[in-house]
């Protein structure tokens, strides 16, 4: 298969340019009305269905005026009755632009916190309590470029957000927990000139930021240009205690570690959308982006040995500096043909660089220098992909879609290490690595309305992956794997039109290692113990993690936006990716590994309703409630608590939002709970994380239609973060406990429209 990869690229490129020639030579004709889509409920027009992720929402100016009027009437009529969450066969929640802007949020992450089944933890978006690669994050159907931060994305530039709970063939099946697809606006009805200024102070961190948006149209061109920038300073104390016991339980080690870190960071970015409306309903869109960052950090640490022999490095001081840039561009060409057929072509390129350097010195208890270490870590990260899909309603009652996706990503890091150690020989090494991932995928899917209240979805996606790693002291390592993902989803509505319905989904998904996870770079720990080992970023032999899943849900929808759902899911995982600590070559090393089979089970309850549904004369307050219980176990790790690392076992959110009539004042708050406890990550290791409770509040005041102020409080309960790590074997155990103090976070922003 991989011997044909160059042919696949050539064929894809030929198809792209062949269609371009056809588009230039064929006369422009108004597109014919498409046949009804099976994903569209009975009695509705095809325009009721949501637009494609990358399709420009603009009428064709070459179409006759009378046709424009009819189209406008159809769209307006459908908007009042179509609900993607209730009507789509695929399990999908669509958050419209109106809902995104309803509460005046200035960051997409604030919008995400209100969405059913979504949790946000440390700026990471999670579904089913799983992040770290299990939840797929897409921008216009593509993975965001390296260095891109979603929290810098202005909600005003977002057309809608899709929460796809079960995988579909159209998108990559690298979505074990699900997919979050953020779709950007391609057309602006009015010109926009926005400026947002923000200030934020949190636990050991203070920042100032700004972002702006300029959007307008000129003839058949619609464009938007956005930018962001910011700077921050941080400084936080840290305390850790280490206790060691022998096989009989007698304490043989006790030490107390304290440290202070302080520094700062600066970042800046530009992103834009250029969308052309072409003849015959065609469109062409480009999304160039550029971002850059830099940071600096200084640290001082000291370890006091209460019991046990001191090492040569109880005192250390160091600095760490870094910078990076990334450039990317997405090109999207949509061509429409007769009878509703459509070809969608995408080309995506990204080029990124990172440069980090660190310098540290360590001293004995007598303040004699014992170690000096200097490390340089330059890296390059490049990606290119080309994808296409063809859809046609050629068969009545069916919506057929087929396509391909080819891609190449390459990561080339280097490590230059100079270490002078009084207890060992001087180290002066240069290590160069290269990791490459090639992907080839084909897919097809069909949606079918079997009856007026029953629809089904069939999909099949095949993805082949080849990884290649090489570098200093490392043999060339190649891994080839492929995943065939049959997918099935069905929706059945109760015939009494009560708003009740049932869903079922069967999926085959996977999580593939990225180029960063394949490069075995090692960052050396000064102390180097079983609880503070060297960190190896990657493993050249890492295999993809495969998952077979079943989802079932009962949903009930009422008028005025009230809804309730109960859902359950099971995921059976093989070649589960985790991290393990090993004693290799005289040093403790923590690295990623494949750790056998695992199973994850989840049950979730979600509800939201406006108070006016129950009390019509009540103030406009919206309530939302979500609780999720996640169970998991890893077969290769003995219990108890042998669950998936970083999965939240129990989480719950209760929130309310108030919007004054006219929208002058918007306010709200939420209480969030996330359980913690012990998790056994390997045969010899246990981690502990404290349960987290958080209260968050905000108020938005619209002084004028063009000026609004937003104030936000987070971490109101000021709960400290307590973590622990334990390593044990036949000789005894060592436990490291740490405490990070916490404080209330305060933020304020001013949004100005020109």
Regions found by a protein language model. Name each.
Residues 318, 322-324, 379, 431-438, ...:
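Outer-membrane beta-barrel signature, preferentially recognizing the C-terminal barrel domain
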Residues 92, 109-143:
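Extracytoplasmic beta-strand/coil segments of soluble accessory domains associated
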Residues 451-456, 563-573, 589-677:
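Gram-negative outer-membrane beta-barrel transporters
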Residues 108-111, 126-128, 175-197, 210:
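N-terminal periplasmic accessory domains that precede
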Residues 353, 410, 466-468, 478, ...:
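Surface-exposed extracellular loop regions of Gram-negative outer-membrane beta-barrel proteins
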Residues 673-678, 700-754:
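C-terminal beta-signal and adjacent terminal beta-strands/loops
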Residues 51-56, 71-103, 132-137, 188:
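N-terminal periplasmic "start-of-domain" segments of outer-membrane beta-barrel proteins
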Residues 142-168:
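Short acidic/polar hinge/loop motifs at secondary-structure boundaries
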């Amino acid at each position: 298969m991989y011997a044909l990869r160059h042919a696949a690229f050539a064929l894809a490129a030929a198809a792209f340019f062949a269609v371009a020639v056809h588009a230039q030579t064929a006369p422009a004709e108004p597109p014919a009305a498409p046949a009804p889509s099976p994903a569209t409920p009975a009695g509705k027009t095809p325009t009721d269905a949501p637009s494609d992720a990358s399709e420009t929402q603009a009428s064709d100016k070459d179409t006759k005026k009378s046709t424009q009027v009819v189209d406008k009437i159809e769209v307006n009529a459908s908007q009042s009755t179509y609900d993607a969450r209730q009507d789509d066969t695929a399990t999908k929640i669509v958050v419209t632009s109106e809902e995104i802007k309803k509460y005046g949020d200035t960051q997409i992450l604030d919008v995400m916190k209100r969405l059913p089944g979504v949790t946000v933890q440390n700026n990471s978006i999670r579904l089913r309590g799983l992040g770290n690669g299990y939840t797929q994050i897409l921008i216009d159907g593509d993975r965001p470029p390296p260095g891109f931060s979603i929290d810098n994305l202005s909600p005003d530039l977002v057309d809608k957000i899709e929460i796809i709970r079960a995988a579909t063939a159209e998108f990559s099946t690298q979505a074990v927990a699900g997919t979050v697809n953020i779709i950007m606006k391609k057309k602006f009805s009015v010109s926009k000139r926005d400026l947002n200024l923000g200030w934020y102070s949190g636990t050991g961190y203070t920042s100032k930021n700004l972002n702006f948006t300029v959007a307008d149209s000129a003839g058949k061109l619609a464009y938007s240009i956005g930018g962001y920038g910011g700077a921050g300073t941080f400084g936080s104390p840290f305390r850790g205690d280490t206790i060691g016991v022998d096989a009989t339980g007698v304490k043989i080690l006790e030490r107390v570690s304290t440290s202070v870190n302080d520094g700062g960071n600066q970042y800046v970015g530009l992103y834009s959308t250029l969308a052309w409306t072409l003849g015959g309903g065609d469109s062409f869109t480009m999304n160039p982006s550029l971002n850059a960052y830099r940071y600096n950090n200084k640290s001082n640490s000291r370890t006091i040995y209460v019991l046990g022999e001191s090492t040569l490095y109880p005192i250390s001081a160091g600095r760490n500096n870094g910078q990076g840039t990334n450039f990317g561009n997405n090109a999207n060409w949509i061509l429409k043909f007769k009878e509703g057929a459509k070809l969608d072509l995408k080309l995506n390129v990204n080029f990124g660089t990172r440069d980090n350097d660190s310098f540290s010195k360590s001293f004995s208890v007598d303040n004699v220098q014992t170690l000096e270490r200097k490390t340089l870590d330059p890296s390059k990260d490049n990606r290119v992909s080309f994808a296409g899909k063809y859809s046609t309603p050629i068969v009545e009652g069916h919506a057929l879609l087929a396509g391909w996706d080819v891609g190449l990503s390459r990561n080339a890091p280097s490590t230059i290490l100079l270490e002078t150690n009084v207890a060992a020989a001087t180290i002066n090494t240069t290590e160069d690595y290269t990791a490459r991932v090639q992907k080839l995928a084909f897919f097809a899917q069909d949606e079918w309305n079997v009856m007026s209240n029953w629809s089904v979805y069939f999909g099949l996606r095949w993805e082949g992956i080849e990884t290649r790693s090489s570098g200093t002291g490392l043999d060339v390592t190649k891994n080839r794997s492929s995943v065939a993902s049959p997918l099935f989803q069905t929706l059945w509505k109760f015939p009494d039109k009560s708003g009740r319905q049932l869903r079922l989904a069967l999926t085959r998904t996977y999580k593939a290692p990225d180029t960063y996870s394949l490069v075995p770079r090692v960052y050396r720990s000064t102390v180097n113990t079983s609880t503070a080992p060297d960190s190896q970023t990657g493993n050249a032999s890492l295999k993809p993690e495969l998952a077979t899943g079943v989802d079932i849900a009962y949903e009930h929808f009422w008028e005025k936006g009230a809804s309730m759902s109960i859902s359950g899911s099971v995921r059976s995982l093989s070649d589960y990716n985790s991290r393990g600590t090993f004693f290799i070559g005289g040093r403790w090393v923590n690295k990623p590994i494949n750790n056998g089979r695992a199973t994850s089970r989840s049950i979730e309850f979600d509800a939201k309703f406006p108070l006016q549904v129950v009390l019509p004369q009540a103030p406009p307050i919206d309530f939302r409630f979500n609780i999720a219980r996640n169970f998991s176990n890893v077969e290769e790790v003995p219990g108890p608590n042998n669950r998936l690392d970083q999965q939240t076992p129990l989480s719950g959110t209760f929130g309310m939002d108030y919007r004054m009539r006219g929208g002058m004042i918007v306010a709200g708050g939420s209480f969030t709970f996330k359980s913690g406890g012990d998790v056994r990550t390997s045969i010899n290791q246990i981690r502990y994380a404290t349960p987290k409770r958080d209260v968050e509040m905000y108020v938005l005041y619209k002084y004028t239609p063009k000026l609004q102020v937003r104030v936000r409080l987070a971490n109101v309960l000021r709960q400290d973060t307590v973590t622990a790590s334990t390593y044990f074997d036949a000789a005894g155990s060592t436990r490291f406990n740490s405490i990070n103090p916490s404080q209330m976070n305060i933020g304020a922003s001013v949004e100005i429209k020109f």
